[in-house]
């Protein structure tokens, strides 16, 4: 068996339910009705609150449990003395509470009510069976199907994964698309698919280096197979024998580029802001399959553009495109360097090299149009694996109807508790798949509803609704002496600095620190416009109140001192950017599950996807502001702020 399937030295089970423990926190008289195994488990949990680090090892906790049950059955102890009397004497609700907190970060797991009642963890004489973990495993292991791949590798798959592998083996020369929900093991499945295809002739593509590393681990130790989207495009564009262009140590800022290109501005926007708007236009162009810049790529404006304004913007964007062609080192200043590389490769007519027979794309919901064009020019078989719910801002990749499609709904990362949270979201989305999500019964992800002013535990990932939400949580957590980090530290610090400067434009002036204003504020001429755009965002209103109370660059610098990338820091990340990743502990912010009416059905659909992404990231524990089912029901009864005609 592969190590990712099961580690017999991993999880240890305690024979008591979470509900029983929570009941004891309210009323200790519940001890009277508990069995000896349950009482022993309660004592073990209490001991965790004061145990030393080495005793927190699951195996050590299991030994304590076994000794308690052995003492209960075999003694020696005085008449009338047993686990019941000792549990009542030693019971401490405070220790039990903190012991339960320790379990959240350990490899100890509480059993469900049915398994506690079955008592299969006991030997015939009533003592603890140390083989319980290994005996329990076959009954709950989702990886029950053995497969021997083309390289004589043993793979253990779920039933759904095994069915898909059989389809591929029976039809190796047919295109295939797999729509798989979060946690189905797409990267592992992709590794199994590659094993069944011709060695050295499969091109595996992943969107990010992190996803590529995960894929390589599944393929095999030391594997260098596969490329990121950017690496693939760069390889197509590189000319043999020509040295790679050296990156300039210092690149010109946006203001300098605007002056170089004679971008004077339009409407009330100056040259720098106009360049930011041109970058939005170019990003839309790079995501499309179009060959030339057109009005279809113009970003949305609250006040519609005149024909002259549109022509001016297209001319400026054309100049910027030419500049980027001549100065590729400036790509990294745009915020979308990978899209630029793919667009250049597509426009140049490149295709997948003929030495490859198959192309496999992981996380294909984020697959841009130019990459699809490059692949379609070749004659390779294309296999895509994606999850449409992990694309919050649109439908994502759509394969042709004639392409064989398969759905996988069984998640090996998410358990029944997460299943009950996600299915209401799937049911309420207006367009996407309605196939019911199914979590593995052997997985126990803890669910906790947190109060206001809650401080997450160390190492928790806080998934937010917007940059304002991230800024709010960073300020709140710093006030509580927590160390925080961001998925994009530089970008988030630039956002906060730009917000402070724009709020106090009379004191600082936009870009007064010599750096470019964050692209989020490309359309903002003044703070009043930012207010208008975000007046329904509670996190923005909270941040604005802090700015009004005197939060300035000096306070921002003090806040920055608490930024850290250490493992025990709290990572803040927009939920829609967390797709394809997984974390032990995840918190969803109140603004992510906002109660204010949404702008329209499209905005609500996007938020449903963002909440889906957030819920499905957790391996061990989820912290929620309130119940997901109630949140969905609440918004079903709400009207949107805007309604669209037909």
Each model region followed by its residue ranges:
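The feature marks helicase ATPase cores and/or their adjacent C-terminal helical subdomains
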Residues: 1-646
